[in-house]
Amino acid sequence: MEQEKSLDPQLWHACAGSMVQIPSLNSTVFYFAQGHTEHAHAPPDFHAPRVPPLILCRVVSVKFLADAETDEVFAKITLLPLPGNDLDLENDAVLGLTPPSSDGNGNGKEKPASFAKTLTQSDANNGGGFSVPRYCAETIFPRLDYSAEPPVQTVIAKDIHGETWKFRHIYRGTPRRHLLTTGWSTFVNQKKLIAGDSIVFLRSESGDLCVGIRRAKRGGLGSNAGSDNPYPGFSGFLRDDESTTTTSKLMMMKRNGNNDGNAAATGRVRVEAVAEAVARAACGQAFEVVYYPRASTPEFCVKAADVRSAMRIRWCSGMRFKMAFETEDSSRISWFMGTVSAVQVADPIRWPNSPWRLLQVAWDEPDLLQNVKRVSPWLVELVSNMPTIHLSPFSPRKKIRIPQPFEFPFHGTKFPIFSPGFANNGGGESMCYLSNDNNNAPAGIQGARQAQQLFGSPSPSLLSDLNLSSYTGNNKLHSPAMFLSSFNPRHHHYQARDSENSNNISCSLTMGNPAMVQDKKKSVGSVKTHQFVLFGQPILTEQQVMNRKRFLEEEAEAEEEKGLVARGLTWNYSLQGLETGHCKVFMESEDVGRTLDLSVIGSYQELYRKLAEMFHIEERSDLLTHVVYRDANGVIKRIGDEPFSDFMKATKRLTIKMDIGGDNVRKTWITGIRTGENGIDASTKTGPLSIFA
């Protein structure tokens, strides 16, 4: 028998796909017999005592091979079982293993330049040519002499078996494009390529041009013929009991000797070979496995570090994750988001303690991933370890209180707790489920929800304290008292004390609402009598003028009494971030103020000049004698009672009363206290300038 020759690992990986991971020589892996049986697409009958769900092994040898007829790539891996299958094994140094080698897998080396293209109907036609993408022609192919007319060259490429192929590469057409002409039809016919297959070009480290093939599904397991699903390879994630129809079809093809395409790859994994490998692994003897990466089944020899890392996470329903999928032609990798819907053993009869396909998932895009119902924990990347907790409505009158430790389990969820040595417990149950009645949500959780609404969303540091990813030796959750360390007692005290006065605060905020004050003006001060209009201007009767005058005087007096209550709470928070010497200037009818730097103003005269320029307001010579302001205590003072430097430090808000009856609120006078000469009945119709410090 001719000895098998290992192929170029770089071209092998380019044909297998970028997401395929073959373990390195001397590395440690967990061998999953359950996954190996899925790869054979038939549950073998071992006729032996229960096999451990995972077996720790060392990689003795790796051979990269390809089928002589179809160029389908596969690998033969020799594994040696190691003592101790515990997941708490931290590193390989305990076993005296050497660091993983990077010779066979290309690990640790820079990936060579490669390009893959799915063949179109024109590319696969007999007698036609191959349209080369520009990127491939300029980066993978040898440099083309564009000065020649036409630019043409002969390209020599090696396939997966080392056989050379010659193609004529020409740059022509309108618009111009790169084409492979002579020699391409021969390659298509001998390789039996069809539209949908992919061609891979790779530039090796030695500079040689290599060509590989990725065949599209032609029926059998994992085939989605006639489907619009752009990710047909996802069907390979189906379990045996979820694809009985396809399995029967595959077995019929095997019996009929039909080994075309991918069916050939999967058909070569004999059930007897799987049973023999599992039996030898269970006895601690070296064994060999064959893996076809294009068979669309998960890898069953997984890096030990990846499995340990995944099983340190305390998985439970509601966790958010993302998972990478490669398209059937391996042209791109897409990430899909999902939620863990349940954590349950996939096959509790044959593999009761196996983490293989432990997670039952629900996808955000179920149409694309309708066949992927279960995944293994090491295939997903956790996005949020905080499960979704559905709470019943709570009463807003309840005061917040700190939840007690026994009140904070995850209600209505079940998740297993694996012990570090769960793989050794052949027949015993080594996982426990925590379950609670979802109908009786404790008040502590309701209070926590209320606190989140009052104080905002939890900070990242708080969420990090709610760590669900650590295991303890006795298979118990950490005490939920860890939630107490994340709860700020000062916030709790603040809410417990101030909730008694919540009604008063609510009233104060309502009184300071500008919209409600404006509505009050409209409802009280509006006159329902008929108005006369001359040239678009309303003409008020004497009674209307008196009513409005009386209303506005009463409104002004009320404003002075409750000014701080009405405005203080509404604008105080917006002014807290102002630096010393800065204040906000508001027109009466505007909610958005302008920031004014008082530190650059040296006197009150300059202040009014600045305000006049800012709001385009006329300035009067007697302005200073009529201006008053309020200090922080609400005491009315006149300008000059304190130096301008002290006034500048204390002032945070300036409010300019507008012309109530004028047409243009911008064209108003800045005056002092209303008098009979320049009040609301005067021709200027202006109000006072109030300065709130």
From Swiss-Prot:
Residues 115-217 bind DNA. GO terms for biological process: abscisic acid-activated signaling pathway; auxin-activated signaling pathway; cell division; developmental growth; fruit development; leaf development; pattern specification process; petal development. GO terms for molecular function: DNA binding; DNA-binding transcription factor activity; miRNA binding. Keywords: Auxin signaling pathway, DNA-binding, Nucleus, Transcription, Transcription regulation. It holds the Pfam family ARF_AD. It is found in: Nucleus. It comes from the Eukaryota. One of its GO terms (cellular component) is nucleus. Expressed in the whole plant. PROSITE patterns: B3, PB1. Residues 580-668 form the PB1 domain. Interactions between auxin response factors (ARFs) and Aux/IAA proteins occur through their C-terminal dimerization domains III and IV. Auxin response factors (ARFs) are transcriptional factors that bind specifically to the DNA sequence 5'-TGTCTC-3' found in the auxin-responsive promoter elements (AuxREs). Could act as transcriptional activator or repressor. Formation of heterodimers with Aux/IAA proteins may alter their ability to modulate early auxin response genes expression. Homodimers and heterodimers. Belongs to the ARF family. PANTHER family: AUXIN RESPONSE FACTOR 10 (PTHR31384:SF193), AUXIN RESPONSE FACTOR 4-RELATED (PTHR31384). This is Auxin response factor 10. It comes from Arabidopsis thaliana (Mouse-ear cress). The lineage of its organism: Eukaryota, Viridiplantae, Streptophyta, Embryophyta, Tracheophyta.
